[in-house]
């Protein structure tokens, strides 16, 4: 859609929601809403709850900019509702969203696409743990983002606590072999890589606090990688985005070793849009200001089914 066509439509920025990432989503949504209003769009913010269908109808929403993170927002739930209501929306569709947030399902697809993954095992609530990889390992819920519930276990005495924490958020968890590498994240827009940023967290890894606390991590743009490795991580980012059938934009997370191996961690279909978020920073490095990034995402809004 052209900018002129979009400015005639009532746009809702969907934010907040019911997940463990609610506060981050509110920050993303407020930033997007402020940008849209500044650019002259008829935009309103909606804090998503179980009354979302009624709110969308009452506001006579014609297009939705999804700024939700985590469950009930990034997992295909809201996307399915918008499809049923005939409201075009930003980001990926129902299936790609559901696959991306499910780390177990997405790993199967990534492996079939030839993408490199850390060795892992799946543990379901109630099952006995028979550790398949030597310590250290990374324990994480299957369907959460922003490193919620994630822990690194180096000592056997800490394993149960890490399992308990991950099971707080999901009935299925992943236990991955630890990869010693640089944390590198690739920004994707309209299916093409914008660039790659390197993250150096102040703590043990890039956890929730490091992601959303000013000064919690050092960002290096572009990532300090040899030219050939940098090109490869961009290519792998585009490949992962396409493998899940993602639409328009995403952020793809990797660990890159000293030998240049790029281990794929996950694809985020609704990456953060806050002042500390990485996709806007990567886009800025490619010459795309925040307002322009918001506009390009909005212009790609559509029904996917």
Swiss-Prot record:
A Pfam family that the UniProt record links to this protein: Dala_Dala_lig_N
Cofactor(s) for this UniProt protein: Mg(2+); Mn(2+)
Keyword check for Lipid metabolism: no
UniProt-annotated location(s): Cytoplasm
Binding-site positions, Mg(2+) 1: 253, 266
Reactions that this protein is recorded to catalyse: 2 D-alanine + ATP = D-alanyl-D-alanine + ADP + phosphate + H(+)
Cofactor binding notes: Binds 2 magnesium or manganese ions per subunit.
InterPro entries: ATP-grasp (IPR011761), ATP_grasp_subdomain_1 (IPR013815), D-Ala_lig_Van_CS (IPR000291), D_ala_D_ala (IPR005905), Dala_Dala_lig_C (IPR011095), Dala_Dala_lig_N (IPR011127), PreATP-grasp_dom_sf (IPR016185)
Functional description taken from the UniProt entry: Cell wall formation.
Family according to the record: Belongs to the D-alanine--D-alanine ligase family.
Name the record gives this protein: D-alanine--D-alanine ligase
Species this chain originates from: Citrifermentans bemidjiense (strain ATCC BAA-1014 / DSM 16622 / JCM 12645 / Bem) (Geobacter bemidjiensis)
Classification lineage: Bacteria, Pseudomonadati, Thermodesulfobacteriota, Desulfuromonadia, Geobacterales
Gene this protein is translated from: ddl
């Amino acid at each position: 859609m052209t900018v002129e066509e979009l400015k005639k439509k009532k746009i809702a920025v969907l934010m907040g929601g019911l997940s463990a990432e609610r506060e981050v989503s509110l920050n993303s949504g407020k930033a997007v809403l402020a940008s849209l209003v500044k650019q002259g769009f008829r935009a309103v913010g909606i804090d998503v709850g179980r009354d979302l269908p009624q709110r969308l109808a009452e506001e006579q929403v014609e297009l939705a900019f999804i700024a939700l993170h985590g469950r009930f927002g990034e997992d295909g739930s809201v996307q399915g509702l918008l499809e049923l209501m005939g409201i075009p929306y930003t980001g990926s569709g129902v299936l790609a969203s559901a696959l991306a947030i499910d780390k177990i399902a997405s790993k199967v697809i990534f492996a079939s696409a030839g993408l490199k993954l850390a060795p892992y095992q799946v543990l379901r609530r109630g099952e006995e743990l028979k550790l398949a990889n030597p310590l250290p390992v990374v324990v994480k819920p299957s369907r959460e983002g922003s490193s919620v519930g994630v822990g690194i276990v180096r000592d056997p005495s800490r394993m149960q606590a890490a399992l308990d924490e991950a099971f707080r958020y999901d009935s299925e968890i992943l236990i991955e072999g630890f990869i010693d590498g640089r944390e590198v994240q690739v920004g994707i827009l309209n299916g093409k890589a914008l660039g790659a940023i390197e993250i150096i967290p102040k703590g043990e890894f890039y956890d929730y606090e490091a992601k959303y606390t000013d000064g919690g991590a050092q960002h290096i743009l572009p990532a300090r990688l040899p030219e050939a490795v940098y090109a490869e991580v961009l290519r792998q980012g585009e490949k992962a985005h396409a493998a899940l059938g993602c639409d328009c934009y995403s952020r793809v997370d990797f660990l890159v070793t000293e030998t240049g191996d790029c281990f794929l961690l996950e694809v985020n279909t609704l990456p953060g849009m806050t002042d500390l978020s990485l996709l806007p920073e990567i886009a800025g490095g490619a010459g795309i200001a925040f307002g322009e990034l918001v506009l390009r995402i909005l212009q790609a809004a559509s029904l996917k089914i």
